[in-house]
Every structure is written in C-alpha cells, then in structure tokens.
Amino acid sequence: LDSVYDAEILEPYEEMKKDKLLYAKSFYRQYCNTDPFSGKRLVEPYSDHLYVVQNPPAKPLTQQEMDDVYALPYMRAYHPSYEKDGGVPALGEIKYSLTSNRGCFGSCSFCALTFHEGRVVQTRSHESILAEARQMVQEKEFKGYIHDVGGPTADFRGPACKKQLTKGACPNRNCLFPEPCKNMVADHRDYVKLLRELKDIPGVKKVFIRSGIRFDYVLADKDQTFLLSLIHISEPT
C-alpha cells in the first residue's frame, strides 16, 4: 500500500462476510465516495496481505465526449454467438431506443445507478440524438416507433444545479428528498423540444418514453409537463 495515497481503508472482506452491519457500513462509505469531485480511493483488505484498490470516479463526460461515444458505429445487434441459443429476445425492447443522458441525482435508496454513472447528469446534444434516429429510420426492421428516449431517468436533461459542474454533488444532502432543493433547476423544455424534433423526422410515427420519469421532478416544473405526459407516454390498456 506504499504507493496508494489519499485512500480510505474499508472494512476487511473476511470480517464483512461474518457481519451484516460491517457490510452495510462499507457500502455506505463506498456510496459517500462515488462523486468524482470529492471521492477518495478505496482500499478493501483481503487475507494474505492482498488488497483491492478502487480509484476515484472519472470526471463527468462533456457533451462533446458524449456525442463522440454515441457516434461510434454500433451494430444494434447481439453477438453472433447468441444465435445458437435463439438470439436475445429482450433486445427487441431496446433496439430502437435512444440514450439521451447518463447519471442520476434521484438518489433512490434501492438503486445502484449512482455507483454506475454518478449523480451528475451528462447529456447528448440534440444533433447527436437526431442523427442516430435518422440512421434507425433507414433500417429495414424499423416500424416507425422509437421505444424510448431517456437514460437512468428520462426527464433529467442536465445537472441538478450549476454547482454540480464544478463542485460535484452535495455529500450530505439529496437533490429531491425529503423535498426538492431550492437550488435545483427543474425544466423540461429542452426534453420536450427534443421529443418534438424526433417526432418530426420523416419515417417516425411515434416517440415513447419507457425510462423512469421522476414525478417529484415533474411536479417541481410548472411548464410543459402535461404535453410530455399526453403525447409521449403510452396509455394503460
């Protein structure tokens, strides 16, 4: 460990296996270090003087970096090795869906998205998303329906507040619970505009939202949300 600096030593693995409370404590300490601006290196001791070292999370991607990632020539198909097993049926639900963001400041207790993508929301530009949609329209299997436009939370199209871009997420409070933070920017106008632009593409019949929608965030915004619900969310059968 001589070369590992500014690290937080977690509970030893062998002890956590025997104590659920220690496991929960370790999980909480890991959760407190998921922010790229304040998170430390984490070290988990194992037997025989072995250690697992996790570096701090990477900084959020810029919009240009997000666009560059999604401009790569993805195949929208499963690997051919799955053919012998009949393919991947679940792919049909997401094949013609569009990722518009990553990250989530919802902080649901049951959810691990903060560990995967962080609390600072990163977004693609309209141009990047529209270009991908136009490519989908050209595919023979496309029937005119975009199944989803979203991410961890569909209606988050930017960081919760300006502070998150330079300081990261607040370590001791949530953006939406127990009540929305006064600094949170609740605004669906950009998202509604994006949905309209997608719907206007020749060959697109309907645009749906299947990613989760934060209703407390919707209620914090007094504009445009009715149109969002009326046009783009399937009615229950």
Task: Name what the model sees in each region.
Residues 1-94:
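Flexible, acidic/Gly-rich N-terminal and inter-domain linker regions that tether
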Residues 115-222, 234:
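Core AdoMet radical
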Residues 50-52, 80-83, 93-98, 109-120, ...:
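Glycine- and acidic
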Residues 96-108, 191-200, 227-230:
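Structured alpha-helical segments in the cores of large, soluble enzyme domains
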Residues 83-112, 130, 143-145, 234:
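N-terminal pre-triad scaffold of radical SAM enzymes
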Residues 78-95, 210-229:
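Flexible, glycine/threonine-enriched loop-and-boundary segments that flank and lead into catalytic domains
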Residues 229-237:
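Residue-level detector of conserved catalytic or cofactor/ligand-binding positions
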Residues 52-56, 62-64, 77-80, 107-110, ...:
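Short helix/loop capping segments that flank catalytic or ligand/cofactor-binding pockets
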